[in-house]
């Protein structure tokens, strides 16, 4: 006889699997067919009749038998209902198959709303995309003493073409980073790619018997569930009293529409139960990418499986020269990069969209205005991937980037990132700016794949004495939002830096020195002046 504890676990697993058949397979909400305007309304499928085809033996017997009348009962059409299709609520059906939905039906969820699904003492796995790192990393999730937490880093194929970097080198880098930056000790930081199937075995090995996946919308939780189901299929009894076959549990609903999941969804994967939670938003109640971008552009951004490896291998760049007029670079109007005058820059873009340069931001916004005003698509419509409200400068935030040497990556939360590099002999000529829609967080980082690779090699060569992350300089930083009228951006940045670090004086490096002496000439190691990120 099985121990009582194992019987209880099996009983709970059966209950969790049963939930999948009374809930919407896309969003997880409980289905009902009484109130058409209520949450979870669906139309029950009609029973379909399928005629069984006669087998070849029956046909032969019919052709060559002398007693045809005796075959009537044997050859009568046998009718049987078809297997039930996955059930889906009207809200998800309209959005997925008819592309009709309202923002109110796909609202954001606060962290408190998501946590109501998680019992105390549960095993939580914080899913954070490497493309957005560290913007979606939430220290409150990892350090919550009520739960056992670990870090899973998704979408690794969009930062490196080398899966061995995720398997062998990334764990040590993130282990040292969490300890150094957040004072958090963990040996369970796994980087993976669900769409490519990279490192899925390692993810499964760190999952506990009953695990909860938590993260922001479209962080890759549901895609991970499907990758796990594919590699570790779980069998369950078929529906019906006479069913004897087994079928694989249906996968998680994956969509390019943000906030598709709105209730807990549990999956029996191998010998473990994985619970997929709705995505939470730290800026709950504030505008997000869906309030600024066109639906088609947002769809391309969310379809991460379409990302091509050749982008990372070839790294094709666009040259951008800064001018006194404020020449800018954009990708479908999602953001506007304004370099300092007389600088030559290379931009390697990893965000889906069409690249274009304008004389200045005012000219770019006038194109947005004219294209939305035109009833028919104009010649520049392909470069406008934002909603009509984004024709106004008031709907943008001016982010000033701290000084940098060499290459950096500019990260836009829930959108993606691009690489920026100044070329030629180094000379400080001013600060770069990135204008983005309100509600979109921005940060910069040294190229993360290079950080992981160089950090791991340094860790190995020192036999573990040297950490896999630089200790003497900051490699991640928030940006500095400023008013449109601010002209002395370097001085304003210093003031904002001092305010941000008033409770972290150890982060105040080079404060007593003249900033122009520090960033005026190239340094052997980038000083990264005014770089600071609040973990």
Swiss-Prot record:
Cellular location(s): Mitochondrion
SUPFAM superfamilies annotated for this entry? P-loop containing nucleoside triphosphate hydrolases (SSF52540)
**For the CP-type G domain, which residue ranges apply?**
111-283
**PANTHER family from the entry?**
GENETIC INTERACTOR OF PROHIBITINS 3, MITOCHONDRIAL (PTHR46434:SF1)
Q: Name one GO molecular function term.
A: GTP binding
| Residue range of the transit peptide in the UniProt record, numbered on this chain | 1-38
Please give the function described in this protein's UniProt entry. Answer: May be involved in the mitochondrial lipid metabolism.
Record InterPro entries: G_CP_dom, GTP-bd, Mito_lipid_metab_GTPase, P-loop_NTPase
Protein species of origin: Lachancea thermotolerans (strain ATCC 56472 / CBS 6340 / NRRL Y-8284) (Yeast)
The protein here is known as Genetic interactor of prohibitins 3, mitochondrial
Q: Cite the entry's keywords alphabetically.
A: Mitochondrion, Transit peptide
The question of whether Mitochondrion is a record keyword is answered with: yes
Q: Which Gene3D superfamilies match?
A: P-loop containing nucleotide triphosphate hydrolases
| Gene Ontology, cellular component aspect | mitochondrion
Q: Which family does it belong to?
A: Belongs to the TRAFAC class YlqF/YawG GTPase family. GEP3 subfamily.
């Amino acid at each position: 006889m099985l121990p009582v504890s194992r019987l209880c676990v099996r009983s709970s697993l059966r209950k969790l699997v049963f939930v999948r058949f009374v809930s919407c397979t896309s969003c997880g909400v409980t289905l009902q067919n009484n109130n058409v305007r209520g949450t979870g309304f669906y139309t029950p499928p009609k029973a379909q009749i399928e005629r069984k085809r006669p087998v070849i033996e029956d046909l032969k017997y019919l052709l060559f038998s002398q007693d045809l009348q005796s075959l009537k009962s044997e050859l009568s059409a046998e009718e049987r209902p078809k297997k039930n299709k996955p059930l889906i609520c009207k809200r998800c059906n309209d959005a997925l198959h008819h592309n009709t939905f309202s923002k109110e039906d796909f609202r954001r969820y606060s962290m408190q709303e998501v946590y109501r699904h998680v019992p105390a003492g549960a095993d939580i796995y914080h899913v954070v995309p490497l493309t957005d790192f560290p913007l979606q990393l939430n220290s409150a999730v990892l350090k919550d003493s009520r739960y056992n937490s670990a870090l899973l880093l998704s979408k690794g194929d969009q930062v490196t073409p080398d899966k061995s970097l995720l398997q062998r080198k990334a764990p040590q880098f993130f282990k040292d980073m969490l300890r150094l930056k957040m004072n958090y000790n963990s040996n369970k930081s796994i980087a993976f790619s669900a769409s490519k199937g990279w490192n899925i075995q390692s993810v499964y090995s760190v999952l506990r018997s009953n695990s909860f996946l938590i993260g922001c919308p479209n962080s890759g939780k549901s895609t991970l569930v499907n990758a796990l189901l594919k590699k570790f299929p779980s069998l369950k009894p078929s529906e019906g009293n006479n069913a004897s076959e087994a079928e694989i549990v249906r996968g998680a609903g994956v969509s390019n529409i943000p906030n598709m999941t709105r209730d807990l969804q549990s999956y029996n994967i191998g010998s473990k139960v994985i619970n997929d939670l709705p995505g939470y938003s730290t800026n709950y109640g504030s505008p997000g990418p869906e309030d600024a971008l066109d639906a088609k552009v947002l769809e391309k951004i969310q379809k991460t499986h379409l990302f091509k490896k050749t982008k990372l291998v070839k790294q094709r760049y666009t040259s951008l020269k800064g001018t006194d007029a404020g020449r800018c670079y954009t990708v479908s109007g999602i953001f506007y990069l304004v370099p300092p005058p007389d600088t030559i820059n290379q931009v390697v873009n990893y965000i889906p969209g069409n690249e274009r340069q304008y004389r200045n931001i005012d000219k770019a916004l006038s194109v947005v205005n004219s294209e939305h005003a035109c009833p028919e698509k104009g010649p520049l419509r392909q470069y406008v991937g934002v909603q009509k409200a984004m024709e106004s400068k008031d709907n943008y935030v001016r982010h000033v980037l701290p000084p940098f040497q060499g290459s950096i990556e500019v990260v836009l939360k829930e959108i993606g990132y691009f690489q920026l590099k100044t070329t030629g002999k180094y000379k400080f000529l001013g600060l770069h700016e990135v204008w983005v829609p309100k509600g979109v967080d921005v940060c910069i980082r040294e190229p993360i794949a290079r950080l992981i690779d160089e950090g791991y090699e340094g860790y190995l060569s020192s036999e573990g004495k040297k950490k896999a992350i630089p200790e003497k300089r900051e490699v991640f930083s928030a940006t500095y939002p400023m008013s449109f009228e601010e002209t002395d951006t370097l001085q304003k940045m210093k003031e904002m830096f001092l305010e941000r670090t008033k409770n972290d004086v150890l982060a105040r490096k080079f404060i007593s020195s003249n900033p122009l002496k520090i960033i005026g000439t190239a340094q052997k190691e980038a000083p990264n002046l005014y770089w600071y990120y609040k973990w």
